Amino acid sequence: MKTSIAPRNVSADTDCGLFVFGVLAGMLALASCSSRPDAFVAPSDVRDGLRVSDNHHYVVDARTGAPVFVLADTAWNLGALKLDEIDTYLRSRAEHGFNTVMFVLNFAPQAQENNAYGQPAYLGPDKTELNPAYFETCDAIVRKAADRGLYVMLYAMWAGEKAGTMNGYTAAQLKALGRALGHHYAGVPNVIFCAGGEASPHYIEVDRVNAIGAGLKEGCEGRNLVTVHPVAENSDSRFYAASPWLDFYMSQAKSGSAPKNAAYDAAALVLGDWSIAAVKPTMMAEHRYESGTREDPLMQRRSLYQCVFAGGFGYAYGHDALWQMTPHTGLPWMLKGWTPGVENWTQALDTPAVRQLHYIKALLYSHPYLTRIPDQSVVLEGQGGDVFTRVQATRDGTPVRNDATYLMAYISAPRNVVLNTGVIAAPILRVYWFSPETGASEVIDGELPNPGRLSLGERAQGGDWIVVIEDASRKFPLPHFLPAEGR
């Protein structure tokens, strides 16, 4: 049996009808809102730290076990800013719902080796000793981030082909440096370690990366998560699946802001990590950066939802002006492929995409989280052939079993789609649209007999949408009604 549902508008006083983030959300959910009433903001307490979930697919609060979706912002060259500027940056990221920032301790030669105060991160004949003055500044950044409910992902250094210093170290030196850095921040709950940026073949040998990774894990005594950032078009799983120090995988797709990079299938890297034998959480750490202030946010939304619905526990957004901290990055070759589009990094803090990406947290936290799996088999008709038209599906439950309580499908572009609702073990369903652009939830039917096959008509409004189909008896909250501790 196949039931067809055409999109329709419903009034606000209809049971479970139309709800749009706005002033009402700010009044009803003060605990999860900032002065921007439509912002879903991380709480200020990150003192519990993070650990890998028991099923090895997600990360959770280390004390409570509550799921944590990592929405990161890319700030490789954060050290180029002074502390008052950094506070401006961190405040903006928290207000826009990010809960993680990523930056590099030694970003030379892409940037100056010293930070804004003239301090290099590492000293000594081998540059394996931590500079007390530099780390006094870095400690202040970590504290400021914690005060705003932000995790910090600290990259020890970069190993890129033309833009890294990591290749100048021996394995023994890297292990010593990793051990020192790990020890310095051991148990600091909002610190996540990254062994290096673009630290995989063919830029650097696996043995050297394993050395610094093992040093970090040894130095922190296993109290912090440790990962590494691979070269483009790769996941860590290709090189480090057997490395005991690695807690979660990162992928890098195509980072340059050229339009052709938007066509790269980033979600395939994430999905590839889901079912390998060495199961670890996986996230998209670098994809096509934004440039300027007028780009269509659809490109960023598409990448986010496709990667997360493919099994990602997190996602990193990036803007060319913010990772460079324009105008502080000075290598001409970088500016050709990664054009900031603005004269100063502060102009890139509030793009349309930045205002929209955090809505995914409300959607994910309103449903059973740790049992969520990717499942393209529920898309029976309407699957697109590329990232611009794909329908990316996720649900909870067990693969190949009809034990779900919900399913979600991200529809990248207007199209007719047929979904297998038989995976939901319930006679009555609630079906609604969720807008990744506005955060609005629009209920289509709150008491739909489960047809097994559900046909969704093409939305006249166009753009991208998520359809959410649930066991009606579960009475899951619509995405804005969330507990304050959900982050």
What are these regions (language model features)?
Residues 31-32:
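C-terminal motif of bacterial Sec signal peptides marking the signal peptidase cleavage site
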Residues 192, 197-343:
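Extracellular glycoside hydrolase catalytic/binding regions
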Residues 19-21:
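Aromatic (phenylalanine/tyrosine) cluster motif
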Residues 1-16:
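N-terminal secretory signal peptides that target proteins for export/translocation
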Residues 66, 290-291, 300-445, 457-487:
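Aromatic- and carboxylate-lined catalytic core of secreted/periplasmic carbohydrate-active enzymes
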Residues 452-454:
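Short strand-edge motifs at loop-to-beta-strand transitions and within beta-strands
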Residues 37-42:
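Short, low-complexity, disordered segments immediately C-terminal to signal peptides
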Residues 45-258:
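Active-site mouth of glycoside hydrolases
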